[in-house]
């Protein structure tokens, strides 16, 4: 397996404010799979993603990505792990306002010795004609495309997406999902997508469902629907 999570536990606070968010999560994802993580609010979806991404320190358990165990890594080692392996896409874009689209993407291009081709990536994401614009000149969907390009330019092995369409309308959400599907097919990028949208589970290879900090469903999707045909986005 490319990603393996074993008995992962994570809590916050102490004494009366103590809450255990992840209570022993076990799951795995194959290389090149698109995987959706779903569950009710407070079930631990984003916390799981953050632990896998090294953004949050787990209490105990094991997370292995491409054979590398990340539990117990020192801060400098975690930084190297994120730089060498991961790309992040969040609900809000955090683009640098005084940099153009191309310049925003280039910020992350310098983090690797093996970046994707900039012009090819811009074309794939439909940003070629917008590459010299500033974020304030872009629509919400175009800004999210820029954020996706910025995450992808360093050719990550694993793309972590936390509500990537949460702030977008239905049409734009579908367009972004079509792009993620296209990127997965073209580059073979393994993806974990946290979302509240129930329809997205129909387009991915694997579905993980959390409830109260535990995995209650974990299955591979045998009847995938193309993102362009998804309803109720």
What do the PLM-derived regions correspond to, one by one?
Residues 2-3, 8-203, 209-210, 215:
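ABC family nucleotide-binding domain
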Residues 214-233:
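Conserved beta-strand-loop-alpha-helix hinge in the C-terminal portion
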């Amino acid at each position: 397996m490319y990603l393996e999570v074993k008995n992962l536990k994570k809590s916050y606070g102490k004494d009366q404010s103590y809450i255990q968010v992840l209570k022993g999560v076990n799951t795995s994802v194959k290389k090149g799979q698109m995987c959706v993580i779903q569950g009710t609010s407070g079930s631990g979806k984003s916390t799981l993603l953050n632990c896998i991404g090294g953004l949050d320190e787990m209490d105990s358990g094991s997370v292995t990505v491409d054979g590398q165990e990340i539990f117990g890594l020192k801060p400098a080692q975690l930084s190297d792990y994120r730089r060498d392996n991961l790309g992040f896409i969040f609900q809000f874009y955090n683009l640098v306002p005084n940099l153009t689209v191309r310049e925003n993407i280039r910020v992350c291009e310098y983090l690797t010795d093996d970046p994707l081709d900039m012009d090819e990536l811009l074309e794939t994401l439909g940003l070629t004609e917008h590459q010299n614009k500033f974020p304030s000149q872009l629509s919400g969907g175009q800004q999210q495309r820029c954020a996706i390009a910025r995450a992808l330019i360093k050719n990550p092995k694993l793309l972590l997406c936390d509500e990537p369409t949460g702030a977008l309308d239905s049409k734009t959400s579908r367009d972004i999902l079509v792009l993620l599907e296209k990127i997965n097919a073209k580059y073979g990028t393994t993806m974990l997508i946290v979302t509240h949208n129930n329809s997205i589970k129909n387009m991915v290879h694997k579905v993980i469902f959390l409830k109260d900090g535990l995995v209650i469903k974990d299955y591979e999707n045998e009847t995938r629907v193309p993102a362009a045909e998804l309803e109720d986005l």
